[in-house]
Amino acid sequence: MAGIDLNADLGEGFGVWRLGDDDAMLGIVSSANVACGFHAGDPAGLLRVCRSAAERGVRVGAQVSYRDLAGFGRRFIDVAADELLADVVYQIGALQAIAHAAGSSVCYVKPHGALYNTIVTHPAQAAAVAEAVRLVDPGLPVLGMAGSVFFDEAARRGLRVVAEAFADRAYRPDGRLVSRREPGAVLADPAAIAERVLAMVDTGAVTAVNGTRLELSVESVCVHGDSPGAVQIATAVRDRLRAAGVEIRAFC
């Protein structure tokens, strides 16, 4: 049976403020990209999410970001490479401790938001993130965009790279994501998204916003936990894949 990983961004609340339905998403996905406190998340909330993930057998990944709570990590920061390296090391280490206390472990790293998009093409920041992962644990896979500078830097350091596609985001013809500031960047119809994901998994391709066919390498599919209707979208994707004989399983 064919298999694919489903991942979602979780643990992104802060204090009394909650974002998304982490418990419901943990019943659907196979991997949880857990915030590390720099773009979202507080220690108590992160411990709660990691405990719930451990109970459900969901893999935990460190979702590292720029130090940007106010902007939710969605703003580019021109940070020096050595500072970014230290920030990423710190975030992975913090979540490793929390996951360990919860009876789980961090088994991969995924950059978040603006950092994710920046290191597709930014050599210095891509190298800093890859080197930070290597310094913490060279056995940790990194989740990201195929063909990115980040993947080149990670592979150069012997890190395993895991290519992901986005269930609910529109793609540009060059393979990058359409900016959230643009109309149609975030998709919302659960049934249409589910069919789109099945096509991605079956054919290794997706239709870009200009109608052209875009080849994709897909080992994991991200469903954003903070999108409107996230639980309904994730459920539709899971159910459609299962109906087509595709097993939902973690990559690590």
UniProtKB/Swiss-Prot annotation:
Q: InterPro entries this protein is in?
A: Glyco_hydro/deAcase_b/a-brl, LamB/YcsF/PxpA-like
Q: Which UniProt keywords apply?
A: ATP-binding, Hydrolase, Nucleotide-binding
Q: Which CDD domains does this UniProt record tie to the protein?
A: LamB_YcsF_like
Entry EC no(s): 3.5.2.9
What's a single GO MF annotation on this record?
5-oxoprolinase (ATP-hydrolyzing) activity
Query: Which reaction is recorded as catalysed by this protein?
Result: 5-oxo-L-proline + ATP + 2 H2O = L-glutamate + ADP + phosphate + H(+)
Q: Which Pfam families match?
A: LamB_YcsF (PF03746)
Q: Does the keyword Repressor apply?
A: no
- Gene Ontology annotations of biological process type: carbohydrate metabolic process
**What function does the entry list?**
Catalyzes the cleavage of 5-oxoproline to form L-glutamate coupled to the hydrolysis of ATP to ADP and inorganic phosphate.
Subunit text: Forms a complex composed of PxpA, PxpB and PxpC.
Protein family according to the UniProt entry: Belongs to the LamB/PxpA family.
Which protein are we looking at?
5-oxoprolinase subunit A
Q: Which gene encodes it?
A: pxpA
